[in-house]
Amino acid sequence: MPELPEVEHVVRALRRAIVGRRIVASQINLPKLILPLSQPVFNRKLKDSTIAGVRRRGKYILIELEYGDALPPGPATAPERGPAVHRSLVLVVHLRMTGKFLYLTADDAAPKHGHAIFYLDNDRRLVFCDQRQFGVMKLVARTRLSKAKGISDLAPEPFGEDFSLAYLKETLSRSRRTLKTLLLDQTRVLGLGNIYAAEALFRAGVNPLKVAATLSSKRVERLHQAILDVLREAISDSSTSRVNLENSNGFSYGEAFERFWQVYEREGEACVKCGARIKRVSHGGRSTYWCPKCQRR
């Protein structure tokens, strides 16, 4: 599953490609993708909207849709009759395991697993592909976005003021879960998945199986800094992420930091710091990697 850095790279690529474009029409080939909305309602709400922006909240992609001074197309209810008002919606997308966007020309062949197609006013298509069909799309009024399911309970953004050292200390002190399990909880620490949690714990020199509440203040400080450092480096332009929206064969995420991995998927290899062999254990249904010497405590 793409983690925060990979989603950020996708957001940047989408922003360059589609901001300012108008959605002429849309087509849904996988009805469950947009539940509980029906296909006709979903398509009607998107028709003639302009893509005003693309941003991220945690691992969610937020595509902001504007309708200028007109209401979204459709039958007007009684309160909506009269002067036109400004309306805006947000298309909330979670890629889950295999979701990806492609930005195609009219001549490009239809890609496999293309479950949502957005026809734009420049004769291009924005196609959402998802081989495993776990991805999710939903339309939310911008004024209600902060209260939307999946968004409302997210932890603070890691680069915002709210994700402070004090916040992390308080969060860890209240939990009897292991550090690795807690770091994967998006309602406690945002944006980390299996890869970056393992890398942050290694940089901090902390055992992933340690109970969160037992971590010393000094180690919490090291972990806080390690989380920020790992995410910043993976998001930076020098990372190895490749997001080519125009070529499905060149589309690659989940590798934004691969050449810098120090423990993840390195079981049995020598630790880059001490030479000990990296270990792996199944924990919480996922593989956890760590150095038994550098991360003893």
Q: What positions do the PLM features span?
A:
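Basic, nucleic-acid-binding surfaces and adjacent catalytic neighborhoods in DNA/RNA-processing proteins
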Residues: R22-F42, R55, Y167-R297
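Gly/Gly-Pro- and Ser/Thr-rich, intrinsically disordered tail segments characteristic of DNA damage-repair
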Residues: M1-G74, P83-M137
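Phosphate/anion-contacting hairpin/loop surfaces
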Residues: R87-G191, Y196-R203, V211
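Catalytic cores of large soluble enzymes that bind and process phosphate-bearing ligands
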Residues: P2, E6, G160, R219
